[in-house]
Amino acid sequence: MSAVRSAPAIPLPRAPGVRRVETGWHRTVRRFRKNPLSVLGALIVVAFALIALLAPVLAHPTERNPYMIPHSGYSSDPRPPGPGHPFGTTEEQFDLYYGVVWGARTAFLVALMVVATAVITALILGSVSGYYGGPADELVMRITDIFLAFPGLILAVVIVAVLGQSVRNAVIAIAVVEWPTYTRLLRGEFLRVRDIEYVQAAQALGGGDFHIITRHVIPNTIYPMLILASLNMGGIVITFAALSFLGLGAPPGYADWGQLINLSHNWIAGTAGDPFTYWYTLIVPGTAIFLFVLGWNLLGDAFRDIFDPHLQGSR
């Protein structure tokens, strides 16, 4: 029996005036590429991500703890950039280059842990508050009001002062500061979505609350959380750097940009005759913080422009 051969498919010419259907992914990429600042932000974030991933290659780690900056003496005077120390050294001769490279990994780890903790907390409390309402909503909102009444940095300082100086305790403190904002945002999105027709249809068909929340509500409320998280990454790193500079975040000698500034805080103003003598002790870690925050802010603005339905109609 002979096999039936199929004729090769011949592509049909596109009719005049008919546009190709654009998928969601292509639409997202197109909107992203239309904004040069979005591309710049993505490039900056990717560059820092590569530095963090390649930290063991770019700066050979110390044997006992890769996050502890090696130092080549105990001289109190910082040394300018030169052979062996391309970015210079801080007080007690901690290598700025090593601290900047491994500090990129610290920045990502701290920011991601804080965001993950805040998002998980918001998914639990915001879902209960926004979906069920009533006493649960009232209780959660009053708790968030209490936390939001305190200035964020001061609250973080108090928490770390009580728990003790460490990276873990600083992460806990910043997460405590951040979770109310995420919770209120998600609760507002739940209030908006829970009365839409497809949610009411799922309830009418006998769907359980957990099924409706996880399958119908959360997927349609998560984008504002992603936008907030991307915009918040830089702020988290600034807060952690501030805690380290105050001696409440990373321990002395830890690879963190705020800790690098703290190690040379006595020399930031330079000498009496030349205030820029030790410029590198502030400019090098300060530039790393500035670029990291700038990259995430530009990327967060891009996500907002792409995913915010109120902005899509005007573009």
Describe the role of every protein-language-model region.
Residues 31, 58, 86-89, 162, ...:
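Residue-level signal for helical boundary/lining positions with a hydrophobic bias
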Residues 2-4, 13-65, 140-143, 221-222:
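N-terminal signal-anchor/first transmembrane alpha helix
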Residues 2-5, 51-89, 244-255:
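Hydrophobic alpha-helical transmembrane segments of membrane transport/permease proteins
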Residues 16-18, 64-66, 71-76, 185, ...:
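Intrinsically disordered, low-complexity segments enriched in polar/charged residues with Gly/Pro
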Residues 10-28, 82-95, 132, 210-215, ...:
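Short, membrane-interfacial amphipathic segments enriched in basic
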Residues 91-315:
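Alpha-helical transmembrane segments of integral membrane proteins
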Residues 10-13, 58, 63, 68, ...:
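Intrinsically disordered, low-complexity segments enriched in proline/serine/threonine
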Residues 1-4, 313-315:
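Short, intrinsically disordered, low-complexity terminal/loop segments
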